[in-house]
Swiss-Prot record:
Domain of life: Eukaryota
Keywords for the protein's UniProt record, in alphabetical order: Cell membrane, Disulfide bond, G-protein coupled receptor, Glycoprotein, Membrane, Olfaction, Receptor, Sensory transduction, Transducer, Transmembrane, Transmembrane helix
Protein name (database record): Olfactory receptor 5H15
GO MF, any single term: odorant binding
SS bonds (residue pairs): 97-179
Gene: OR5H15
């Protein structure tokens, strides 16, 4: 009888933000604009890198893939959020929930490894400039990209597997903006302590590994930059690395709070700021952060616009 009751709940309510009814339309329009800018910004960055052969080097291949993952994460979360602003029902089926979580888990994990790889790329470029073409080849870059996506899929499969063992019989209210393993584990009538443990072990390990890689890489970069006697070289190095460091700080802060800090059944799980930040705000900011501080991207973008204008006339 208990098992039958446990299988009854196959739909969930994503509460999302708690807001007054009069804020429904303004919030919908605000997030719609954010989403459109995010998609145009990231796809535009991908198009610029794709069209310009001069940008077919590791630094920009990594940047293009970061833009792809950001668009992926945003497109997994925002459309459902927009629908919930206008829909009378905020229901999502269990199968949709699992698919959404799986997609987000792949994107978030892949981005962690991409940011670490980008830090290593900058380390080699600045600390070993003469060896950079021999070390950081396009072939190595592509292999690192493939490994990042494979790691993202494997990590998502682990949590997805543990998610399948959960049953839901008491509550179907998910206090989150999307389906995630932590809020789902909190409402499960199955013992979910192993799910929280897996989040702490695997998500924590991935974040620690990527953060340590980034910190070590930029520590060497900092010492190398400080040894430079050329002011122009110092400015160029800080300009190149500053955007990446800023993006890293914005990305890992919410993730650490989300996946390492509250990994316990006692956490209330109702803070929407962290997931909103790394699924909506970061994908919006990344193309702006990287493009505005990168002269080559700006020049290539202007050239692409000029070519398109000539073709249209």
């Amino acid at each position: 009888m208990e098992e039958e009751n446990a299988t009854l709940l196959t739909e969930f309510v994503l509460t999302g933000f708690l807001y007054q009814p009069q804020w429904k339309i303004p919030l919908f329009l605000a997030f719609l604009v954010i989403y459109l800018i995010t998609i145009m910004g990231n796809l535009g960055l991908i198009a610029v890198i794709w069209k310009d052969p001069h940008l077919h080097i590791p630094m920009y291949l990594l940047l293009g893939n970061l833009a792809f993952v950001d668009a992926w994460i945003s497109s997994t979360v925002t459309p459902k959020m927009l629908n919930n602003f206008l829909a009378k029902s905020k229901m999502i089926s269990l199968s949709e929930c699992k698919i959404q979580f799986f997609s987000i888990a792949i994107g978030v994990t892949t981005e962690c490894f991409l940011l670490a790889t980008m830090a290593y790329d900058r380390y080699v470029a600045i600390c070993k400039p003469l060896l950079y073409p021999a070390i950081m080849t396009n072939g190595l870059c592509i292999r690192l990209l493939i490994l990042s996506y494979i790691a993202g899929i494997l990590h998502a499969l682990i949590h997805e597997g543990f998610l399948f063992r959960l049953t839901f019989c008491n509550s179907n209210i998910v206090h989150h903006i999307y389906c995630d393993t932590i809020p789902l584990s909190k409402i499960s009538c199955t013992d979910s302590s192993i799910n929280f443990l897996m989040v702490f072990i695997f998500s924590g390990s991935i974040q620690v590994f990527s953060i340590v890689t980034i910190l070590i890489s930029y520590t060497f970069v900092l010492f190398t930059v400080l040894e430079k006697k050329s002011d122009k070289g110092v400015r160029k190095a800080f300009s190149t690395c500053g955007a990446h460091l800023f993006s890293v700080c914005l990305y890992y802060g919410p993730l650490l709070l989300m996946y390492v800090g509250p990994a316990s059944p006692q956490a209330d799980g109702q803070n929407m700021v962290e997931p909103l930040f790394y699924t909506v705000i970061i994908p919006l900011l990344n193309p702006i952060i990287y493009s505005l501080r990168n002269k080559q991207v700006i020049v290539s973008f202007i050239k692409m616009l000029k070519r398109n204008v000539k073709v249209s006339y």
